[in-house]
From Swiss-Prot:
Mg(2+) binds at residues 18, 116. Belongs to the DNA polymerase type-Y family. GO terms for cellular component: cytosol. Keywords: Cytoplasm, DNA damage, DNA repair, DNA replication, DNA-binding, DNA-directed DNA polymerase, Magnesium, Metal-binding, Mutator protein, Nucleotidyltransferase, Transferase. It is an enzyme of class 2 (transferase). The gene is dinB. PROSITE patterns: UMUC. It is found in: Cytoplasm. This is DNA polymerase IV. The lineage of its organism: Bacteria, Bacillati, Bacillota, Bacilli, Lactobacillales. InterPro entries: DNA/RNA_pol_sf, DNA_pol_Y-fam_lit_finger_sf, DNA_pol_Y-fam_little_finger, DNA_polymerase-Y, DNApol_IV, PolY_HhH_motif, Rev_trsase/Diguanyl_cyclase, UmuC. One of its GO terms (molecular function) is DNA-directed DNA polymerase activity. Binds 2 magnesium ions per subunit. It comes from Streptococcus thermophilus (strain CNRZ 1066). The record marks 23 as: Substrate discrimination. The active site is at residue 117.
Length: 367
């Protein structure tokens, strides 16, 4: 078997900034009466006949087991005292741009992964600060002082570990993983904490008696490649803290969609839902093939009178998973006003895209 040298560039200084429960936090900032209350961004199921899905929620709501992509009905059952807010996504985008302007005060090497998180390469920065930890603290301070919002930061020598570190202490945390600490940090992590390892992959790894980073470290490269395909090559290196992917400031944002026009109009809900599922499947397959993930799902419906409706849902985390895209598409459709006209066109689109590599590849996608 052809072997590749394990080259680990530990000279860089990478920060990953992740806003804490961003949408909910913006709402709480703008409305002080929400302080200490469980806040859910999603339609109130009491007003929609039980329809709707959770986009995100604050940490108070998470104590009740509420999480993104959960049905609003289940979220209400778990936390009946929660405040449901439909969400003002244009406002969230405006705040997100304000955060990016703060990043640009320190470096132009900023790679936005979504509206509320980004990688920054501060190896060399505009203020000439040698300490990446100091830069991270200053960014957290600036975001709080200027926008009254908190974020968590991870600091390390590559994007993979910086991302893991930012999740380690939330909210408002700062975790630093130095090159000499990386191996110990990774070995102690449960395998499900490795970004991109989905539920099915966790089961498959558990079947191999892999429960932690330390367990993963024991598995040979050829075994991982044989079991997980080309991602095994990457996973072998990630277990050793090796990931030399650069911070890419000029990322091309596109959308992936599937639309179908029907010569014979669709009237029955079963037929419409079946066609939505076909579109969702096409979008998921295209996203996986293009190695893209997205966190905004849009559906488009055109009726027999050529009137057209579009509605979108922004998720807490990016996805390319068919089940998620399908479920959210159906939930969005259920929120549309009832229309007795026949359906002439249906479309599903995944947008707010990012590279699958940046999100950390899902083993399920590549095995």
């Amino acid at each position: 078997m052809l072997e590749f040298p394990l080259i680990n560039d530990t000279s860089r200084k990478i920060i990953h900034i992740d806003m804490d429960a961003f949408f909910a936090q913006v709402e709480m900032r703008d409305d002080p009466s929400l302080k200490d209350k469980p806040v859910i961004i999603g339609n109130d199921p009491r007003k929609t006949g039980g329809r709707g899905v959770v986009s995100t929620c604050n940490y108070e709501a998470r104590k009740y087991g509420v999480h993104s992509a959960m049905s609003s009905k289940e979220a209400y059952e778990r936390c009946p005292n929660a405040v449901f807010i439909s969400g003002n996504y244009s406002h969230y985008r405006e705040v997100g741009m304000q955060i990016r302007e703060i990043f640009k005060c320190y470096t132009d090497l900023v790679e936005p992964m979504s509206i509320d998180e980004a990688y920054l390469d501060v190896t060399t920065n505009k203020l000439g600060i040698k300490s990446a930890v100091k830069v991270a603290k200053l960014i957290q301070y600036d975001i709080w002082q200027e926008l009254h919002l908190t974020c968590s930061a991870g600091v390390s020598y590559n994007k993979f570990i910086a991302k893991l570190a930012s999740d380690f202490q939330k909210p408002a945390g700062l975790t630093v993983v130095l090159p000499e600490e990386a191996q110990d940090f990774l070995e102690k992590l449960p395998i499900e904490k490795f970004h991109g390892v989905g539920k099915k992959s966790v089961e498959r790894l558990h079947d191999m008696d892999i429960y932690t980073g330390a367990d993963l470290l024991k598995i040979s490269e050829i075994t991982l490649i044989d079991r997980f395909g080309r991602f095994g090559f990457d996973l072998f290196r990630k277990a050793r803290g090796i990931s030399n992917s650069p911070v890419k400031p000029n990322r091309v944002r596109k959308s992936i969609g599937s639309e179908r026009t029907y010569g014979k109009l669709l009237y029955s809900e079963d037929d419409i839902k079946a066609e939505l599922t076909k579109n969702a499947k096409q979008v998921a397959e295209s996203a996986q093939k293009a190695k893209k993930v997205g966190r905004i799902i849009v559906i488009k419906v055109r009726y027999s009178d050529f009137s057209t409706l579009t509605k979108r849902m922004t998720l807490d985390k990016s996805t390319q998973d068919f089940d998620t895209i399908d479920r959210i598409s159906h939930s969005i459709f259920d929120q549309l006003e009832e229309n007795s006209s026949g359906v002439r066109l249906l479309g599903v689109t995944l947008t707010g895209l990012e590279d699958q590599e940046g999100r950390q590849l899902d083993l399920d996608d590549l095995a």
